[in-house]
């Protein structure tokens, strides 16, 4: 039991004192007030390990001096309207203090991440940072899994739970009192952590609230780290190592060395992990090859663990057990599912013949057509039923600008959803955008869509084709079998670094 307890300590030795001399001697809201200077991000550290910033403490000192030299009496009303820093607001100072607290609190967490990469040269290869790079891994692993746990991340019922979470990483009592004071004031102003991550990012105190949310979720995820370590005897390297190809080769080389030295005969150590885990859009997704009974036991185990250790009232109906063969999962703008392809093989032995029915699992990535149509309807490209309509807001633009905007949306969608196994939904979305563009141009010129399309001809659709589609159509005929396989099969690209706006569910 003592050995298991050590896994749940969660880096308790990483307890740091924050930079309180800087807080007490200077005005902390000057550190984070950078809107009028055009600065981005944190300006606190000079060249601290783990921070990529070109600003130094000298800039902070100049900001403080500039603030002290301002004369608040002679400020006109027009100046105060331009700069909210000088607007009388009782919540302004607490907001600046909270943002400054988040800047300082991020220091030990950044040092913890950098310590895992100690002694390694950090090289960046953009082609391995693509969102699409995870799908080839899922194609190999996901089809072997049986059940998926879809867990909605529980929200803390009281602010003291957040303070207790930070207490594991910070031993400064005054820091905890300051945190509790800020949370108490935010609760009085109606600012809480209840809601999704997208709602938190829209808040004015997003840096402070996101820091609390991430630290709280990190503490709740300790049970997943514990289960992962118990199910696999060879621990994986840090997630940051997978940002570069060189670390992948180093890990592979280390794997071969360990295999030849220690585990030459005992091959069961190299079995697949007990479960696969990912956090996405305010929920946890766990996939495993276990039975339904095992997943049910894990479900109630998670509920009891979070209630006893973090005082979270997590109801069992917020955890869903999905069979990966039937119910698709929404992940990074795609619908993931595993389809069973039946096949019949006729076997004959001497004079007797019989049929053998086999089922082959196939991993599928589908385009969420209904959610994309809903996003297009909100953007006024179509109605809720998916019927294209004109875009009145773009009717004042030139014809080339209108065609360029619609064409860019089509190409971006084709680029992002090129890995879908079935392209029917993607073709429907592109059809909506093409016809919406034609209706917008016809509305501008006060003509009908048919007459306008007849006047433009086939050159009108050239702007809507993706460049890879043009190359394939030039090399191969559309009627050839190779061309049909290229169009229908998934194509993954390694230059996609963010989720498409229509698929992010934040609109």
Curated annotation (Swiss-Prot):
**Compartments, record wording:** Plastid, Chloroplast
What are the alphabetically sorted keywords of the record?
Chloroplast, mRNA processing, Plastid, RNA-binding, tRNA processing
A single GO molecular function term of this UniProt record? RNA binding
Cite the Pfam families for this sequence. Answer: Intron_maturas2, MatK_N
- Keyword Manganese attributed: no
List, in alphabetical order, the GO biological process terms annotated in this UniProt record: mRNA processing; RNA splicing; tRNA processing
The principal localisation class reads plastid
Q: Name one GO cellular component term.
A: chloroplast
Residue stretches spanning the membrane: none
By its UniProt entry, which InterPro entries does this protein fall under?
A: Domain_X, Maturase_MatK, Maturase_MatK_N
| Keyword Heme part of the UniProt annotation | no
**Similarity comment: family membership:** Belongs to the intron maturase 2 family. MatK subfamily.
UniProt cross-references to HAMAP family, sorted A to Z: MatK
User: What does the UniProt record say this protein does?
Assistant: Usually encoded in the trnK tRNA gene intron. Probably assists in splicing its own and other chloroplast group II introns.
List the protein's name. Answer: Maturase K
